[in-house]
Amino acid sequence: MTTAKPPPASEAYRSQAGHYDRRTDAFRQWRELLVASLPLRPGDTVLDVGCGTGLCAPLLHRQVGPAGTIIGIDESEQMLAVAAHRVTEHGWDNVRLIAAPVATAPIDGMADAALFCAVHDIMQSRAALDNILAHLRPGSPVAATGGKQPAPWMWPLRPWVIRLHRPFITDFTGFDRPWRLLAKHVPDLQVRELAFTAGYLAVGYTPGVRQMRKPMTNKAKQSLTKRAMRKHARGHSVPTRALLSGY
């Protein structure tokens, strides 16, 4: 007897693009935490990897301003159509949307930062990470957040977490440590677990020194992450509510 493989996550995103924002509204606290962990400056160019409907764009635009550039990448044309409507509605002329798999997305020039918000399949793709990291300047901040397999001592949560994320993840390989491949590109990657170990925030910098800025010490990087955590995730109440919505 053979078991049918689950449909790729891209089908779920395609079918749910119209109401994706409503379904993931509770997850906004994680998005805020993610963007707050990036030391963005006005005028920066940031890569929003697997941007979906563009829910991170307002937060990013607030940081980089009209002089900055936001490049959203997603292979779902249905999700990007919603993102394009959001961009038009806000009148942003500095947001570029690329409809392509992240591994082969044609990214022009170099960016100053990248974020990965609830994109497990992309985080497990070496080719996707290679393409993104190849377009980041030395010393660029990188941040990722999403769900993960709860720790063994939280085993009652495991079936529930898997069921919650199954529509949006094609392959659960690496779900115990979703950041493992990213850590190979970002040697100083720091990881904090969220939602009773069922979620995570990973923040680090690409190797090298970022130009036109005094490089941050490890102590300063740790302080930045801790401040973001205290501001957006006091206790476990916020991440737990966010977890209810899945991606």
What residue ranges belong to the model's regions?
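Conserved class I S-adenosyl-L-methionine
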Residues: 1-39, 160-165
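Class I SAM-dependent methyltransferase SAM/SAH-binding core
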Residues: 47-49, 53-103
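A short acidic, Gly/Pro-enriched loop at the edge of an enzyme's catalytic core
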Residues: 103-114
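A short SAM/SAH-binding and catalytic strip from SAM-dependent methyltransferases
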Residues: 113-126
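A short glycine-rich, Lys/Arg-flanked "PGG" loop and its adjoining helix->strand segment in the class I
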Residues: 128-138
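Conserved beta-strand signature within the Rossmann-like core of class I S-adenosyl-L-methionine
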Residues: 139-147
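Short alpha-helix
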Residues: 169-185
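Core SAM-dependent methyltransferase catalytic element
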Residues: 187-215
